[in-house]
A protein has these predicted regions:
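Short, charged, amphipathic alpha-helical segments
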Residues: 24-29, 43-47, 66-74
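Non-transmembrane, amphipathic alpha-helical segments
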Residues: 12-15, 19, 37, 61-71
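Acidic/proline-rich low-complexity IDRs
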Residues: 7-10, 36, 47, 64, ...
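Acidic, low-complexity, intrinsically disordered interaction modules
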Residues: 34-65
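Amphipathic alpha-helical binding modules
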Residues: 54-88
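Short terminal alpha-helical segments
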Residues: 1-29, 77, 82
Length: 88
């Protein structure tokens, strides 16, 4: 299974806020693996993660999150920013 396929699988799996910590960890692992395969895989993972997180960010009101959910959201945001902005 390619890293892009793994990314898509992860995106479909983690819909609940309570699962975001696990999702962030898994997504970071997918990204690190994609870096080993080259720029094409990385760019595909970046595009998918950016689309996903843009949607999540638009749907989530941070004021409505409890402490655990806010922590999970912040971790996911950190991982997504790393994927989006890290220079290779």
């Amino acid at each position: 299974m390619s890293y892009v396929e793994k990314t898509l699988k992860a995106l479909r799996s983690y819909r609940k806020i309570s699962e975001w910590n696990h999702f962030a960890k898994e997504f970071e692992e997918v990204y690190e693996g994609a870096k080993e395969l080259g720029n094409d895989e990385v760019e595909q993972v970046r595009a998918l993660s950016d689309r996903y997180f843009s949607r999540v960010r638009g749907e989530v009101n941070k004021d409505d999150l409890n402490e655990e959910e806010l922590e999970a959201f912040t971790k996911l945001e950190e991982v997504m920013n790393k994927i989006k902005y890290e220079e290779l």
